A protein has these predicted regions:
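Hydrophobic alpha-helical bundle cores within soluble ligand-binding/oligomerization subdomains
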Residues: 1-157
């Protein structure tokens, strides 16, 4: 077992001007970037994950393993159960200025989801956001485009 207080390297003021290039400033089990191999999620090259179902990619990021068929089906079913968006979110989005940038709308949508469905559990809140974002994004698009009232999602499709 390694000593948690062991000094691994020394950073000098001159290193700060390079953006700490070459010095690890944190570790993460979820993703890594290698200058030669590129971006990896949980050890998988990102190109190998490009054709996954979105739910399979979300499962990988949450649980650090690719789901088998049964796990993926159960995960999709769980997201469907959680997919209902509080009407307060949609009504508040409808009141936003149309001139706002789409990313500002997305930030507002995420904030509204957090304010209307907080459970106190990081995992539960994350699953709720994943399940509800498709409807929020679709509502933002309809509202900003002037296509009328947002249409309730059909997550089972």
């Amino acid at each position: 077992m390694s000593d948690q207080n062991e000094v691994l390297f020394e950073i000098k003021r001159e290193h700060l001007n390079t953006g700490l290039r070459g010095f690890p400033v944190g570790t993460c089990r979820t993703s890594s970037v290698d200058p030669l191999e590129g971006l990896h999620y949980v050890g998988y090259p990102i190109a190998d994950l490009a054709d996954l179902d979105p739910e399979a990619a979300a499962y990988l990021l949450l649980y650090k393993a690719l789901p088998d068929a049964d796990q993926l089906a159960a995960f999709k079913a769980e997201l469907i159960k959680r997919s209902a968006v509080n009407p307060v979110v949609i009504n508040t989005l409808k009141a936003l200025p149309k001139e706002g940038h789409p990313m500002e709308w997305l930030i507002a949508g995420l904030n509204l989801l957090g304010m209307t469905s907080k459970t106190g559990s990081f995992e539960e809140d994350g699953l709720n956001v994943i399940a509800r974002m498709p409807e929020v994004v679709a509502a933002i698009y309809r509202i900003r485009s002037g296509w009328g009232e947002p249409i309730a999602s059909k997550p089972e499709l």
